[in-house]
Amino acid sequence: MRFFAFSKNGWKKYFLLPVLSMLSAGTSVSGASADWNEKTIRDNLQLVAEWQAKHPKKRSPLHWTYGAFYSGLVQYGLSVPEGPGLPLLRKAGEEQGWKTLNRHYHADDHAVGHAWMEMAMEDGNPAAAEKIRAVLDKVMNRPSSASLQFLTPGCQDRWSWSDALFMSPPVFVKLAAYTGDRRYLEFMDREYKLTCDYLFDREEGLFFRDSRYFTVPAANGKKMFWSRGNGWVIAGLPLILQDMPADWPSRPFYEDLLKRLAAALKKCQSSDGSWHASLLDPDEPPLKEMSGTLFIMYGMLWGVNQGYLDADEYLPSICKAWKAACDAVSKEGALGWVQPIADKPGHYSGKDTEVYGAGAYLMAGSELRKYVIDRDHPQKKTVTVTNPLGRFRPAETVSVPWPSGGSGDAAGLRVFDVRHGRVIPHQLADTDGDGTTDTLLFQSNFRPGTVRDFWILENSCLGEAPSADVCFSRPVPERLDDFAWENDLTAHRIYGPAVARPAPEGEGLVSSGTDVWSKRAGAPVINEFYKRGDYHRDHGRGLDMYNVGPGRGCGGIAVFRDGKPHVSGNWASARTLYNGPVQTAFEVVYAPWDIGGGVRVAETRRVTLDAGNRFSKVRSVLNVRGAETVKAGVGMDTGKRRNDYEAVMEDRESGGLMTAWSRPRKDDGCLGTAVIVPWVPEGRAVDAEGCTYLLRKVANGEPFEWYMGAVWDKASPIRSAAGWEAEARRVRECIGHPLQVRVR
């Protein structure tokens, strides 16, 4: 029969075996159709994930078998966030305290770290990484020197068996991505290559499971290579490569190993589409085995999707493997034909299931879903984003001109995160205020030195990403002309004309400083606070405990003359430009004020705040009359009088930075505030009237940028002045090294 599949070079006709004719839902006798259709694949993944979750094995949820299941579950969960995958993982991690079993040097007990590290980065949850990091720090700092010869004392404290190359190395790479500490990569590199040199058979291009099988042949007299043992290796390589920096010196070693192993495994595929347990003796036993098959399929398909493997050459094998796998799924979602826990080929039946088999199915199916989405959108645009820094960058916004070669029609527009296989929230914005949409905004996390692709899909039938306008700003006329803005992490307000009036019409407060609202992460508070009115006490969502007064609060401008700061009054006009799931933007105008010597200054300020960020970006333009230039100061409150500061830090390296840590009220926790300027200040910081300023010369109409941010220790993993300073330094480094974006 003829089967048509999409290759990287277009549609190609394959002449496959008659057994492959059952590639449609109408002829499948299993519970999982083998159709290469996005919804069908997604339904299959949910079916298998839910069945396995409802049928747990009687062993620790931290066992390596569950580690392999979680590896598939996290890929499925990240690709279908509305599905059951991520909730199941969060529940498992929280119930187990994100820990590992007690064999700290044993690779098997590291396997749960795949999912724990992904959840740490996905959720911004450092607790998910702490315990696995402590374990691997111990392994790295006090490495074992045991022999790799299997069954010798301490051999399993090293990666002396092929399974270990899946269980442990990817966790080291993920820790390097999360922490920016390249020592994890160096350790992994050294140990991996030693194991590869020891277990890899260069003649056959396959891995022995361990050294016992160097001399133990298969029943037919050929070398014994176990399919799942090789499946572990080829499935582990994508987990390593996807988080390894693009410029890592030995990256080509892993790329070449993927190609060599895939080529050798392709030759071993049986006519039923699977890889039998014994690769060179498929009659030992003559049965399809699904865990090895699906791990191998995943590694091959990832290689195709990334361009390492030729699609025309490997797609027929992948098609046959997926058909065999779907035929092994019952109508209830149980994946059968999975060899039980073993270290060599053995016997099993269609009734044998295992959690690692389901994990392999979720990995392979999630990767296949990406391929199908690629195939179904031939007109897509690709946005390639490079992180030039050697550090993890959470919640970074990517800005792309719109329309970028497309129709400019927002209907059916989707932004697809290729790494995670999911549609992500996006926002179309008019960033220059001319009434025309000009920019596409979206966000992701970026790991050190990595290159990521995102697809812009127009007229797509994929479902929209769940999103809410978490980035929000508005004028608040009902509260004396406040103007407030917030995202999922932080909230602020500035003061308008009405509050400056004397009582009883106003409060007599003249201030162009910025207030900080302490809020619980994820909870919108602006409308609730103003509706309640009583926001100076914490009713569960946060409170206003910060004292601004006439100072700069957590960020503001002063113009200096003769060494003295001159500040504006309250804002004269303020308007929201746009709100959305990624960014809010607004414009504020401060009316002209006298700075002496016949000089008057006005400020127009544009402020943006992105989701997942604690810092607002400010672009100020001064309108100067009576002088060619003035000395502007970007400042923040640092004096004891208003907020009882416990620590204040100022640094001028690579751009100015100030941080402060205060306890405005005894029982309501601490606030961190900070100002960052992406330019080198003139001289040292200047203290004046309870505030500290970073100075620069500014000409009339010359824009300059600065950032202000805040954190509340009761709603953040940042719990100290040192932690807040480290976060501000991280943000400053990211500001100085923006993401590199290319559209093609």
Residue ranges of each PLM-predicted region?
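Acidic (Asp/Glu-rich), glycine- and aromatic
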Residues: 603-605, 609, 614-649
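Beta-strand-rich recognition/accessory modules
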Residues: 433-446, 673-744
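Extended ligand-binding clefts on enzyme/binding-domain cores
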Residues: 162-163, 173-279, 286-297, 309-338, ...
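CBM-like carbohydrate-recognition segments
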Residues: 35-67, 74-95, 99-122, 126-138, ...
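Solvent-exposed N-terminal domain segments of exported/luminal and surface proteins
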Residues: 455, 460-565
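Alpha-mannosidase-like glycoside hydrolase catalytic domains involved in N-glycan trimming
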Residues: 378-473, 509
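Extended, loop-rich substrate-binding clefts of extracytoplasmic carbohydrate-active enzymes
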Residues: 527-611
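Extended ligand-binding groove/face enriched in aromatic
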Residues: 86-90, 98-214, 219-223, 331-332
